[in-house]
From Swiss-Prot:
PROSITE patterns: COX2, COX2_CUA, COX2_TM. Residues 56-73 are mitochondrial matrix. It is found in: Mitochondrion inner membrane. Cu cation A2 binds at C212, E214, C216, H220. Mg(2+) binds at E214. Its cofactor is Cu cation. Cu cation A1 binds at H177, C212, C216, M223. Disulfide bonds: none annotated. This is Cytochrome c oxidase subunit 2. GO terms for cellular component: mitochondrial inner membrane. Residues 7-33, 99-242 are mitochondrial intermembrane. The gene is COX2.
Length: 242
């Protein structure tokens, strides 16, 4: 049976794109945990407000003699602290895992410019003796082919193998940009004069889309990112063509 994955933005979408990496699995899980605590807190606070309004709306005298309540003050101090601890611990663990890059099998350097991306496969040397690199520009609307996505497809995609530890090194030639691929759980600033890194392990073959997520000028929306994850054999065949 085939399973359809949502790897692109959809109109009126209210949830995340489908996950393709363990990192994004963790982000979605943390989101669901935090949302659970938020719903519990909202329900509890709403119930308390309802009870207070109901009990004191017709009695204008009794609450005037409530000068303090030590037990109540302890409860409303400890309860938020406990909730914050339950949120903090998994978020700290996930933050560490997202930031740690251990022994990547392949490195891709993403260089942002106004308004396109340059990708360098520094681990591979082409037939000319230079590293494999290429520029990636948006496909104009009037040049789109059937099946291509407006404002998302590019003339040259990043191609990577699945089930391989990848490291993306991100930087910029001019202003601050941002390298973001939602389905991979990646969002990394591209800052001039600085190298930032982020890792990914793609678990399935597909085409993933992202965009520059930092306002970088008049054509900010014309800096899409398209990444195609393929099998090792297909990746090696693609690499031979470069």
């Amino acid at each position: 049976m085939f399973k359809i994955f949502n790897d692109v933005p959809v109109p009126y979408g209210l949830y995340f794109q489908d996950s393709a990496t363990p990192t994004f699995d963790g982000i979605i899980e943390l989101h669901d945990i935090v949302m659970f605590y938020i719903v519990v807190t909202i329900v509890l606070v709403s119930y308390l407000l309802f009870v207070i309004i109901k009990n004191f709306s017709n009695d204008h005298i009794s609450y005037k003699y409530l000068t303090h309540g030590t037990t109540l003050e302890i409860v409303w101090t400890i309860f938020p602290v406990v909730i914050l601890l339950f949120i903090a611990f998994p978020s700290f663990i996930l933050l560490y895992l997202c930031d740690e890059v251990i022994d990547p099998a392949m490195t891709i350097k993403a260089i942002a410019s106004q308004w396109y991306w340059t990708y360098e496969y520094s681990d591979f040397i082409g037939e000319t003796g230079e590293i494999v690199q290429f520029d990636s520009y948006i496909v104009p609307t009037d040049m789109l082919e059937n099946g291509q996505l407006r404002m998302l497809d590019v003339d040259a995609r990043i191609v990577v193998p699945t089930n391989t530890h990848l490291r993306f090194i991100v930087t910029s030639r001019d202003v601050i940009h941002d390298f973001a691929l939602p389905s991979l759980g990646i969002k990394c600033d591209a800052t001039p004069g600085r190298l930032n890194q982020v890792s990914a392990l793609l678990q399935r073959e597909s085409v993933y889309y992202g965009q520059c997520s930092e306002l970088c000028g008049v054509l900010h929306s014309s800096m899409p990112i398209a990444l195609e994850a393929v099998s090792i054999d297909k990746f090696l065949s693609w690499l031979d063509e470069q």
